[in-house]
Amino acid sequence: MKNLLPFLTRVPIKGDFEKVREELWAFPLVALVSSALPTLVLYLKLPLSNVLAVLALYFTIGLLHLDGLADFADGVMVKGNRERKIKAMKDLNTGIAGLFAVVMVLFLQVYSLQLVPFYAIFLAELNSKLAMLLALATRKPLGQGLGAYFMERMNSGQLLGGFIFYAILLVPVVVYEQNALVSLLGLAFGGYAIKVALDNFGGINGDCIGAIAEITRAGTLLVVAFAGAYLGG
């Protein structure tokens, strides 16, 4: 996991980028680090804790995934064939679709965090990291960028390892609060985002993976918020 942290977070430790793709199974473990600061903010119930928690999250993980979300949305929403969509996604200028997607994801997270228990951000990050692993497991790269680089070493063993660590990290939260199981529904957002990427672009690149991570996290928080508000979760 040491090699993954500098890639998926802003934690100032040294890692070997060449070894990152050998540790894909550890994606879920990164959630322990990426969610630590925002979870603490929520636990302490600080004023405007929902806003501060989102700021703490992006302070930890950076804005790379949000940038990918913007590019992804621009590509998905443009009209035309697959080549035109890919061109729009790779355009350096952010369009209105990308801006809207980023604003909506931030809004959903900030609003949902008012309605969820303090550990929900950990569950959301756990789902987010697993969804990234599932995206790599498609082994359908778009171009020769980071997505293709990681997919070269993606295999059933790495995927199984990721699921095992996902379960190991989820179980203690469920023991603490059984209703935490509802967070599993958040993975549906990730699955849908993967399908959208494949349908629109025919493959998955780094921008798609970042978008999948953001959509899954926001979707998970939304599910947990609805469960808490309407189902007594």
Swiss-Prot record:
Entry annotated with the keyword Transferase: yes
Keywords associated with the record: Cell membrane, Cobalamin biosynthesis, Magnesium, Membrane, Transferase, Transmembrane, Transmembrane helix
Cofactor(s) it depends on: Mg(2+)
Membrane topology: Multi-pass membrane protein
Pathway this chain belongs to: Cofactor biosynthesis; adenosylcobalamin biosynthesis; adenosylcobalamin from cob(II)yrinate a,c-diamide: step 7/7
Record's catalysed reaction(s): alpha-ribazole + adenosylcob(III)inamide-GDP = adenosylcob(III)alamin + GMP + H(+); alpha-ribazole 5'-phosphate + adenosylcob(III)inamide-GDP = adenosylcob(III)alamin 5'-phosphate + GMP + H(+)
Cell location: Cell membrane
TM region(s), chain numbering: 24-44, 46-66, 96-116, 117-137, 156-176, 184-204, 209-229
A GO MF term: cobalamin 5'-phosphate synthase activity
GO cellular component: plasma membrane
Main location: membrane
GO biological processes: cobalamin biosynthetic process
EC number in record: 2.7.8.26
The UniProt record lists the keyword Transmembrane: yes
Coiled coil spans: none
Protein family: Belongs to the CobS family.
Biological role: Joins adenosylcobinamide-GDP and alpha-ribazole to generate adenosylcobalamin (Ado-cobalamin). Also synthesizes adenosylcobalamin 5'-phosphate from adenosylcobinamide-GDP and alpha-ribazole 5'-phosphate.
Protein name: Adenosylcobinamide-GDP ribazoletransferase
Native source species: Thermococcus onnurineus (strain NA1)
The organism's taxonomic lineage, starting at the top: Archaea, Methanobacteriati, Methanobacteriota, Thermococci, Thermococcales
